[in-house]
Amino acid sequence: MSKKPTTKKEVQTTGHSWDGIEELNTPLPRWWLWTFYATIVWGVAYSIAMPAWPIFASGATPGILGSSTRADVEKDIAKFAEMNKAVEDKLVATDLTAIAADPELVTYTRNAGAAVFRTWCAQCHGAGAGGNTGFPSLLDGDWLHGGSIETIYTNIKHGIRDPLDPDTLPVANMPAHLTDELLEPAQIDDVVQYVLKISGQPADEARATAGQQVFADNCVSCHGEDAKGMVEMGAPNLTDGIWLYGGDANTITTTIQLGRGGVMPSWSWAADGAKPRLSEAQIRAVASYVHSLGGGQ
């Protein structure tokens, strides 16, 4: 009886064999192979039609279709700027103290000011404006330099101790009493106890009494005789329990020893020919927004 012929195509092997097990050389399905070729063609076509290959001088090849997401974004920004132009012109022309009486400006500054704050201010002052160590809360009404809308506007526009803006608020730094040899270490320890006492914290009574005299001789010119601070000097109230850098003994000691001198950047200053970080309308919007948070005076 003859063997029945078969038309089944034998699958080739790679020639490798191990313990009777051979490695097959099965070709890829045709549909998969043609899909692979199609992706190559698509990739080449896309790189010709659209921006694709990096170029040091101009960023990337432009593509023959001239598509640019950056240009699209710029068009959208220009469109919305044109939409808001009328209300922004009105905002710039309105006295700062009159903004709160204009419903249209109130609505605009609450929304636009919040957007500016989230973009430029939240990194330091927090998303909810509650502040961080070294960056004041804008909610509590405790203002080192004043909380009127005019003052808030000026501080945003020109900054505080910003060395680049000649119109910045030139308030004095907290001196480094140990580094500059203004006080002896024992005197610093005494005045720390006095500050703890007047801020309602546990303190060494004997050292606090000695520290009161040190305070009177060295600190009242900025913090005032009642230790409640002076806006003109940018000196904080030491009796209310609100602390910019911390109110524990170690932090107060560090502050007195090494001093403090935080910088609020100027948001209107720009180098020659450069564009300011914030426009006049944006500064007014965020100033009005901050003033409305509950801490404004």
Swiss-Prot record:
Record: residues binding heme c 1: C121, C124, H125, M264
GO terms of molecular function: electron transfer activity; heme binding; metal ion binding; oxidoreductase activity
PROSITE patterns per record: CYTC (PS51007)
Subcellular location field: Cell inner membrane
Principal localisation: membrane
Highest taxon of the lineage: Bacteria
Cytoplasmic side: 1-35
Topology versus the membrane: Single-pass membrane protein
UniProt domain Cytochrome c: residue ranges: 108-199, 206-294
Residues binding heme c 2: M174, C219, C222, H223
Family of the protein in this entry: Belongs to the CcoP / FixP family.
Protein purpose: C-type cytochrome. Part of the cbb3-type cytochrome c oxidase complex. CcoP subunit is required for transferring electrons from donor cytochrome c via its heme groups to CcoO subunit. From there, electrons are shuttled to the catalytic binuclear center of CcoN subunit where oxygen reduction takes place. The complex also functions as a proton pump.
Name of this chain's protein: Cbb3-type cytochrome c oxidase subunit CcoP
Source organism: Rhodobacter capsulatus (strain ATCC BAA-309 / NBRC 16581 / SB1003)
